[in-house]
């Protein structure tokens, strides 16, 4: 947040130099004066402001839990991308356990590949069958004065997981899919 504050101190607004952040979300904006941040952007796989039935249910469940447990901020409960990712992960694990009919890790791991879940993003997330990374949508949101985001761009659907960046020299020759013929140690 100090970076944004300094931009404001220098008289630079989002209309002059828009900044795209990859780690600023609803929780980071809680309790912060968002006026100087309005118009800056963030890229995530989920924003609380998304409008769809799955997100409405997700926010309602979280608000009830936060109130019941008397969590800090329960009077104005927030959801964010890391929470949505955890929520998806727990449900996919549950589905994999049910498919494997076991809690045994060696049985659950192969069962998790290919799992799908209608996520709070409004899209169906998918666990890649080979590398176990999620296929998820991408959203770009513009910071609003109330600390929420207005989605200004989104992918038409989930983006296939690419676990190794080709832009990092050490990763350029890494395979996105594990070698299933390699022997376990």
Task: Please describe what each predicted stretch is.
Residues 1-185:
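Extracytosolic ligand-binding ectodomains
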């Amino acid at each position: 947040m100090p970076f944004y504050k300094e931009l404001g101190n220098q008289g630079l607004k989002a209309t002059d130099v828009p900044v795209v952040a990859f780690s600023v979300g609803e929780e980071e904006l809680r309790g912060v004066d968002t006026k100087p941040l309005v118009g800056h952007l963030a890229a995530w796989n989920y924003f609380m402001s998304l409008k769809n039935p799955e997100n409405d249910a997700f926010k309602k469940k979280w608000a009830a839990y936060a109130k019941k447990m008397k969590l800090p901020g329960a009077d104005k409960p927030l959801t964010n991308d890391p929470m949505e990712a955890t929520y998806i992960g727990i449900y996919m694990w549950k589905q994999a356990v049910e498919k494997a009919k076991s809690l045994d890790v060696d049985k659950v791991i192969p069962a998790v590949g290919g799992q799908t879940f209608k996520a709070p993003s409004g899209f169906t997330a998918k666990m890649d069958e080979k590398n176990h990374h999620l296929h998820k949508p991408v959203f770009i949101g513009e910071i609003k004065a109330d600390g929420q985001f207005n989605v200004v761009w989104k992918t038409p659907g989930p983006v296939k997981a690419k676990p190794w960046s080709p832009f990092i020299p050490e990763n350029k020759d890494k395979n996105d899919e594990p070698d299933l013929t390699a022997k376990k140690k």
